[in-house]
Amino acid sequence: MKERTKATMEEKGENKALAISFLKALGYNEQQRECAVTLWTRESRFDHLARPRDSSGKPRSTAFGIAQLLRERSGEPELQILHGIRYLGHRYGGSACRALSHSDRRGWY
């Protein structure tokens, strides 16, 4: 049986709702939540199976999942979201908007 490489639309919707819920529970205000949603929509469309691929379909990076983290290996959306939030905290002082601004300028975060 072929391994799935994409989440369903329903799974993506559930992942997005879960991310918003986690961000809210962790004290991210509405603006910061919107920035995180914009960023992760751009990165993966909330697909927990997402990997960047070239035109032939081969992976072009080790980035994986909702937040497209380089060392992410968990297929669990909950863990991917929590790791993504932790990365925002470590790299951008907890500011999803700062991460989004960096992504706007550089094409990555």
Where do the model's predicted regions map?
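N-terminal secretory targeting signals
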Residues: M1-E11
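Peptidoglycan cell-wall recognition and remodeling modules
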Residues: E10-Y109
